[in-house]
UniProtKB/Swiss-Prot annotation:
Topology in the lipid bilayer: Single-pass membrane protein
Function per UniProt: May help in the organization of the PsaE and PsaF subunits.
InterPro entries found in the cross-reference section: PSI_PsaJ, PSI_PsaJ_sf
Family according to the record: Belongs to the PsaJ family.
Protein name: Photosystem I reaction center subunit IX
Subcellular location: Plastid, Chloroplast thylakoid membrane
SUPFAM superfamilies: Subunit IX of photosystem I reaction centre, PsaJ (SSF81544)
Principal location: plastid
Statement: the UniProt record of this protein carries the keyword Cytoplasm: no
Transmembrane segments: 7-27
Lineage: Eukaryota, Viridiplantae, Streptophyta, Embryophyta, Tracheophyta
Gene: psaJ
Keyword Transmembrane applies: yes
Signal peptide start and end residues: none
Length: 42
């Protein structure tokens, strides 16, 4: 179990998991608020 914790706390695993989280968050924001970038100019 300690080896699994050590593996999950390494930098590539943390980076990939954070990128997946951010990508999912952006997808969900764009699903509920489509074309939100065009509203920034008004």
């Amino acid at each position: 179990m300690q080896d699994l914790k050590t593996y999950l706390s390494t930098a590539p695993v943390l980076a990939i998991s954070s990128f997946i989280f951010l990508a999912g968050l952006l997808i969900e924001i764009n699903r509920f608020f489509p074309d939100a970038l065009t509203f920034a100019f008004f």
